Design a protein with these regions (language model features):
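Short loop/turn motifs that connect adjacent beta-strands in outer-membrane beta-barrel proteins
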Residues: 20-21, 55, 93-100, 139-149, ...
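Residues that define the transmembrane beta-barrel architecture of outer-membrane proteins
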Residues: 6-8, 40-42, 80-84, 123-131, ...
Length: 221
């Protein structure tokens, strides 16, 4: 069963650097469902960041997530998730395109409402692997990450694994396209459209989420 839904996501990314190789990353994500009328999710991510080379970034971080009932296949109650993750980003140039490959492994602890005991929560631990490919093209002839307009596309695949994974091993697929403006070397804004295919834990219900996404990037050095 497929449910088609419309969402609004707002993301604020900050990645200040303390030195040529070391920095930190903080990310706040506010997700609204049903064309913005109800809450879907709130997430906060923080991680130290190591840049051993210009084309390589390594980070190990923590994410807190709060999920609300929404849409055709709502969760039973609001619940929280705590997540650790390890991430590797490889960057390269393909002509005028700036290309990034992001590999992420997550360990997820959540407490959704019990399916068999009303009023009780169950503890669930799962692992998830994610791969994202993103390409960015400057539109005014500028070098990537310097002021000016640009366009970007990306795809991302999510695969769950572990003893407590339900029937949604596939988990998610995302495809994104958008345009942005690098305001300064340290700040930019991006607006785009994201289509998300999200498989539910029963393995038979799928969300097809059409999402307008607004992102603010802040990268002070």
């Amino acid at each position: 069963t497929f449910a088609s839904q419309r969402h609004l996501w707002l993301t604020v990314n900050a990645e200040p650097r303390f030195s040529e190789r070391w920095g930190t990353r903080a990310e706040l994500i506010l997700r609204r469902a049903e064309e913005g009328r109800t809450w879907q999710q709130v997430q906060f991510r923080v991680a130290p960041v190591w840049n051993p080379r210009r084309d390589l970034q390594v980070s190990v971080g923590y994410l807190f997530s709060r999920t609300f009932p929404y849409g055709r296949f709502p969760v039973r109650r609001v619940f929280n998730e705590h997540r650790l993750y390890q991430q590797l980003v490889l960057r390269s140039a393909l002509g005028r395109f700036a290309v990034a490959h992001r590999y992420r492994v997550e360990q997820r602890w959540s407490r959704p409402a019990s399916a068999t005991e009303p009023g009780r929560y169950t503890s669930v631990f799962t692992n998830r692997a994610r791969y994202q490919a993103r390409a960015m093209l400057p539109l005014a002839g500028q070098v990537a990450a310097t002021p000016g307009p640009y366009t970007a596309v990306s795809t991302e695949v999510f695969v769950s694994f572990g003893a407590q994974v339900g029937r949604n091993v596939f988990d998610q697929f995302r495809a994104y396209g958008g345009c942005g403006w690098q305001l300064t070397k340290a700040a930019g804004i991006e607006l785009g459209y994201l289509q998300q295919i999200n498989q539910q834990s029963n393995g038979t219900n799928f969300e097809r989420n059409h999402t307008a996404q607004l992102t603010f990037n802040i990268n002070p050095n």
